[in-house]
């Protein structure tokens, strides 16, 4: 739930990137159809925010997300995640799972494909549990 203390870092039709006051970056997908340029721009801003924050923690809210297309999956696997780990310091991803089962499957395929990257993903049904896990990782890191 967004409130006035959240700092929106970037927003387009794909979703919203927020510098969460609890101490991590937050990516929230919208349910709209994604255009490649907008998708790439959106994820690029996530990378920049993570690099600026330097804590390696990202809350990924996929509740309203539609499934990744094959091209989106390739982009995330081959370009965005490796770059965000290297340039953004991405280490911990707390994913609030999508309502759409096909979106869940698409995300699982991405995570399986990048399991060699030095990062951890955990899936959650509830936002509060995702936040608690992410903050715990931050304290441990």
Language model features: what each stretch is:
Residues 1-141:
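Amphipathic, Lys/Arg-enriched alpha-helical "gate/interface" segment within cytosolic domains
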């Amino acid at each position: 739930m967004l409130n006035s203390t959240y700092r929106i870092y970037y927003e387009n039709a794909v979703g919203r990137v927020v510098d969460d006051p609890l101490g991590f970056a937050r990516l929230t997908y919208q349910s709209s159809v994604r255009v490649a340029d907008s998708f790439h721009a959106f994820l690029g801003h996530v990378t920049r925010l993570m690099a600026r924050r330097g804590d390696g923690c990202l809350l990924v809210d996929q509740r309203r997300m539609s499934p990744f297309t094959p091209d989106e999956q390739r982009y995330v696997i081959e370009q965005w995640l490796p770059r965000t780990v290297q340039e953004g310091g991405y280490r911990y991803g707390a994913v609030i799972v999508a309502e759409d089962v096909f979106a869940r499957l698409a995300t699982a395929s991405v995570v399986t494909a990048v399991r060699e990257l030095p990062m951890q993903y955990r899936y959650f049904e509830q936002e509060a549990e995702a936040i608690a896990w992410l903050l715990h990782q931050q304290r441990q890191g």
